[in-house]
Amino acid sequence: MPKLKTRKAAAKRFKATGTGKFLRRRAFRNHLLDHKSPKLKRHLATKAVVDRTDEDRVALMMPYA
C-alpha cells in the first residue's frame, strides 16, 4: 500500500498534541489591531484546541500526526 500524503496546507496550520488533539491559531490577529485592547490581543496570541466536530477532518488531512 502506498504511503499516505499529508495535506501541506493543514500541516502548516495545525499542530498535534501528545493526547491526539490539534492546536490552531486564533482568527482576528493579522491586521486592524489598533482598536483592539491589549488584553484581547494577548488572548488572540494563544493557541486554541480544534473543536471536536472538526478533529476527524484535520486528522484525515494529517495521517502521521
UniProtKB/Swiss-Prot annotation:
PROSITE patterns xref list: RIBOSOMAL_L35 (PS00936)
GO terms under cellular component: cytosolic large ribosomal subunit
Name the record gives this protein: Large ribosomal subunit protein bL35
GO BP annotations, alphabetical order: translation
Entry similarity comment: Belongs to the bacterial ribosomal protein bL35 family.
SUPFAM superfamilies (UniProt xref): L35p-like
GO MF: structural constituent of ribosome
Alphabetically ordered keywords of this record: Ribonucleoprotein, Ribosomal protein
Keyword Translocase (UniProt): no
Family annotation (Gene3D superfamilies): 4.10.410.60
Membrane-spanning parts: none
